[in-house]
Amino acid sequence: MAEDDMVSLLFKLKVEDVTCSDDPEKHMKNASNERKPLIEPVENQLMDIGEEGGSLDYWLLYLYVDCLTMMCCFHRGSLPYNWMQGALLTNLPSYQHDVTLDEVNRGLKSASDFFGYVDPMRSDYFTAFSFPGRVTKLNEQMELTSTKGRCLKFDLYASTQLRFKPGELVRHGECKFAIG
């Protein structure tokens, strides 16, 4: 069903100001070279979360999903089932610079036993929520190993109420974990 929605959005997409080029390969390389500094992490770079917008005074929980699911959350106002009892969220921030995406996937898979976390591409996006009093803190924690070998622990939360209010989804985007 979500795939049908995305396909219908693509059919409605209008592309304007397209010109024909005699050397598309050259333009593709130029575009790729311009994009590289934007996507390649710099050693020991910390993300300035102030750039994300919004107040940082409230408590945030993160849901790690693929791009399509993130967009469905954003447009439909509902959480996906990614756990046997609803939605599994964590307080692991999406810009944790000393944890790799593979390690996050390993931790989420062991915590949730959800098949979706086998492939790192299924969780390289996030949605961040502010749920005052709507989630249950689980007794277990997600244990991750940092890139420096330290053990990091993050709390896990469950939500059986999958619909959320528009103001509760406060951020969404691509994860900024360490490369490794």
Curated annotation (Swiss-Prot):
Q: Name one GO biological process term.
A: cytokinin biosynthetic process
Q: Which UniProt keywords apply?
A: Cytokinin biosynthesis, Glycosidase, Hydrolase
An example Gene Ontology molecular-function term: beta-glucosidase activity
Which InterPro entries does this chain map to?
Glyco_hydro_41
- What EC identifiers does the entry list? 3.2.1.-
Kindly indicate whether the keyword Plastid belongs to this entry. no
Function of the protein: Hydrolyzes cytokinin glucosides thus liberating free cytokinins.
Q: What is this protein called?
A: Cytokinin-beta-glucosidase 1
